[in-house]
Amino acid sequence: MKIILFDNKINSRLNKITLTNYAAKLDQTSEIWLFNCIENIQHIFFKSQLKSSHITKIFISGTSFEYTAGLPGLLSSLTLSGRLHPISIYSPQSLKKYLEACTKYSQTNFSFPINFHNLQYGGQVVNQFYTVICLPLSKKSLLYGFIILKKEKQGVFNLAQAKTLNILQGPIYGKLKEKDNFLSPDGYYLSGQDFSSNTIMGHKISLPLLVRYSRIISEMHWFCSYPIRLNTYSHQQGVKCLPHNVLTDIMKSQIYQDNSFVE
């Protein structure tokens, strides 16, 4: 999986911060999972050379305009491009009513079905390779963060070596792949580790869409295989702009301190 970070940008003239937006491109397929849909998202996709037609799932962390500004426009663009495949949106419950109101007053109809899923604590998407977990970032569960878990990959069984040792095909192949050991009648010792490659461990990818420091943010970063890079601003700069939506150097050091303490 490749994570594309649509980076934070501070607009000094308007004294405003654009929230972080992510796109996850799956390795096995050409699918793209979009996390949040900020304003001007179509232009961002064009600059990043990603194809918006490959979007199959959209995860919205909150109903604020900062998270959903580009969603109606993106869906309309997909309609104009002739999309027919369904798209799944994982969001708070009120987002469905918002989109229904947008289509009503703009007199727009989408050419593809939209499947809405209400966000709640726990696994939202579970497939053969990945699991997306949703975590509430506020007490009233109005804002959510996401964790992507890549499942471990079992080692490949070395069939050629088994045939070289004249091991008959059967249930013993499965046991050897599970790295069980056997002692043959002629005294030959079979080690399961010699018949399969090592298991590739899974990965944890944290997508802290709300970058304000909190305990849950530290837990999201705990044991992350690939922590997502976030812009770190000086504490004075963060206070000047918007302190509850920017990651300052003090907050970042606090997160690392929490993780080192738990480990």
UniProtKB/Swiss-Prot annotation:
Cysteines joined through disulfide linkages: none
An example Gene Ontology CC term for this record: chloroplast
Record-linked InterPro entries: RibonucZ/Hydroxyglut_hydro
Cellular compartments annotated: Plastid, Chloroplast
Major place of residence: plastid
Domain of life (superkingdom): Eukaryota
Gene Ontology MF terms: 3'-tRNA processing endoribonuclease activity
Keywords: Chloroplast, Plastid
Alphabetical list of SUPFAM superfamilies matching this protein: Metallo-hydrolase/oxidoreductase (SSF56281)
Family affiliation: Belongs to the AtsA family.
The protein's name: Uncharacterized protein ycf56
Species in which this protein is naturally found: Pyropia yezoensis (Susabi-nori)
